[in-house]
């Protein structure tokens, strides 16, 4: 092909590209199409074909130029419909889906790790409470035995000091418990509500509206239940106590802190962790 024909051929390609461009809205697919055409043997064959046409073309004939532009445009449209082009588009969509799934999986794993850590802290805290309960019961027994034997004032003073130390430790523990529940009780009970709604047998039964309940009131109710459970655990036999809030019952059971009365699902009691140690 001589230089004049080559220049003319490039002008036709440029003009045709201007015709195709407004019809192509998806730039990513156009890039894929161009990559496919450049690497495909079909393009070589098309160029050779058009070189022959251009070599016979006279620049003065505008009608012939327009005709060649339309024919080249149709050739490009046919190439876009090539079977080899479709798998590339499909692969691109699959790759995007895989990328989105990986991002979601990573996010879910991070959330799972946070929830596991919170549950671990709650179980550890419950174990500490049980240890304190056992220690308190033992000290009360020792105090009762000493009182019956009528120990001297020095022993009585030691008991008073031990009692004061116990009361101080108990106060510190309950202060920590209050702070923990103030910060985490609403979110923990909200998770328990989600579990209740998921397992609710009747789809038409209305679920409790968590947002309409004061977080402060809910936290205070949760604190009262914990205090009642701890006081109740000191009683021989540790009878079950009634808890009216379904969310609190659900959370205590899911966190393996309490067991439910087989006769009444609204009654619970603390699991004796000290017996398992």
Curated annotation (Swiss-Prot):
Pfam families noted in UniProt: CENP-K
Protein's cellular compartments: Nucleus; Chromosome, Centromere
UniProt-listed InterPro entries: Centromere_CenpK
Example of a GO cellular component annotation carried by this entry: inner kinetochore
Coiled coil residues, start to end: 96-138
Keywords: Cell cycle, Cell division, Centromere, Chromosome, Coiled coil, Mitosis, Nucleus
Gene Ontology process terms (BP): cell division; kinetochore assembly; mitotic sister chromatid segregation
The keyword Cell cycle is assigned to this record: yes
Function: Component of the kinetochore, a multiprotein complex that assembles on centromeric DNA and attaches chromosomes to spindle microtubules, mediating chromosome segregation and sister chromatid segregation during meiosis and mitosis. Component of the inner kinetochore constitutive centromere-associated network (CCAN), which serves as a structural platform for outer kinetochore assembly.
Sequence similarity: Belongs to the CENP-K/MCM22 family.
Subunit comment: Component of the inner kinetochore constitutive centromere-associated network (CCAN) (also known as central kinetochore Sim4 complex in fission yeast), which is composed of at least cnl2, cnp3, cnp20, fta1, fta2, fta3, fta4, fta6, fta7, mal2, mhf1, mhf2, mis6, mis15, mis17, sim4 and wip1. Interacts with mis6 and dad1.
Alphabetical list of PANTHER family matching this protein: CENTROMERE PROTEIN K (PTHR14401:SF6)
Protein name: Inner kinetochore subunit sim4
Species annotation: Schizosaccharomyces pombe (strain 972 / ATCC 24843)
């Amino acid at each position: 092909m001589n230089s004049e024909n080559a220049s003319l051929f490039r002008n036709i390609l440029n003009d045709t590209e201007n015709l195709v461009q407004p019809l192509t809205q998806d730039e990513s697919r156009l890039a894929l199409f161009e990559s496919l055409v450049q690497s495909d043997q079909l393009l070589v064959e098309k160029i050779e074909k058009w070189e022959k046409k251009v070599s016979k073309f006279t620049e003065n004939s505008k009608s012939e130029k327009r005709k060649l532009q339309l024919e080249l445009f149709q050739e490009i449209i046919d190439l876009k419909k090539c079977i080899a082009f479709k798998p590339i588009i499909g692969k691109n969509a699959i790759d995007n889906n895989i990328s989105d799934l990986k991002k979601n999986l990573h996010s879910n794993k991070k959330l799972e790790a946070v929830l596991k850590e919170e549950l671990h802290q709650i179980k550890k805290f419950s174990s500490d409470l049980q240890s304190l309960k056992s220690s308190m019961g033992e000290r009360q027994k020792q105090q009762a035995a000493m009182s019956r034997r009528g120990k001297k004032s020095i022993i009585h003073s030691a008991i008073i000091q031990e009692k004061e130390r116990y009361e101080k430790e108990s106060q510190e523990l309950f202060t920590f418990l209050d702070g923990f529940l103030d910060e985490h009780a609403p979110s923990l009970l909200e998770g328990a509500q989600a579990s209740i709604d998921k397992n609710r047998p009747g789809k038409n039964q209305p679920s409790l509206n968590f947002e309409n309940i004061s977080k402060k009131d809910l936290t205070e109710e949760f604190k009262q239940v914990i205090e009642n459970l701890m006081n109740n655990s000191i009683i021989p036999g540790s009878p079950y106590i009634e808890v009216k809030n379904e969310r609190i019952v659900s959370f205590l059971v899911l966190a393996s802190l309490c067991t439910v009365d087989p006769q009444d699902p609204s009654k619970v009691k603390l699991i004796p962790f000290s017996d398992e140690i």
